[in-house]
Amino acid sequence: MKMEVIFKTDLRSSSQVVFHAGSLYNWFSVEIINSGRIVTTAIKTLLSTVKYDIVKSARIYAGQGYTEHQAQEEWNMILHVLFEEETESSASSESIHEKNDNGTNECTSSFETLFEQEPSSEVPKDSKLYMLAQKTVQHIEQYGKAPDFNKVIRAHNFIQTIHGTPLKEEEKEVVRLMVIKLLKKK
């Protein structure tokens, strides 16, 4: 499904990004953590899959004429606000940014660690669910508390929806049980 993004005019004062999926009548919104400066991996992943011309198209669909230059400027502002601003609560810039293989900075939020690492050799039949469970456990170990599981599932659903395979209810339960099992092993 083609996903399009429409942002509120002033992202800095907004607490939501509004996503438009498929039909013009299909709307849903997602809260941005910490006043728009830190977002979950799901939103980052979605943003990285769309280009600034999607913003342009979305504005046109919304009845607001937009030039390509304006769309590019807005897209750059969005990327700056979401990915380059640091929060005062962050421990250090070194812990937030890691160098990837290409030498560019990759921002890592608490939810990004849930999805970016490979599962261990002990992988059950459904590696997708096992990976999600593993990342949840890693989050618990790293931050000393469990993430809001519903947020983790929602984040995973956004990523998976892009590929056409959202989690089913029974899969969510499987992940929850895997997390409990993995925690008991520790």
From Swiss-Prot:
PTM annotation: Phosphorylated on serine residues in the 115 N-terminal amino acids.
Upregulating conditions: Expressed in the early phase of the viral replicative cycle.
Entry keyword set: Early protein, Host cytoplasm, Host nucleus, Host-virus interaction, Phosphoprotein, Virion
Chief location bin: host cell
GO cellular component, one term: host cell cytoplasm
Cellular compartment(s): Host cytoplasm; Host nucleus; Virion
Residues forming coiled coils: none
Assembly and oligomerization: Oligomer. Interacts with host HNRNPK.
Function field: Modifies the subcellular distribution of heterogeneous nuclear ribonucleoprotein K (HNRNPK) and may contribute to modulate HNRNPK functions related to processing and export of mRNAs during ASFV infection. Necessary for virus internalization.
Family from the record: Belongs to the asfivirus phosphoprotein p30 family.
Protein name: Phosphoprotein p30
Organism: African swine fever virus (isolate Tick/South Africa/Pretoriuskop Pr4/1996)
Biological classification of the source: Viruses, Varidnaviria, Bamfordvirae, Nucleocytoviricota, Pokkesviricetes
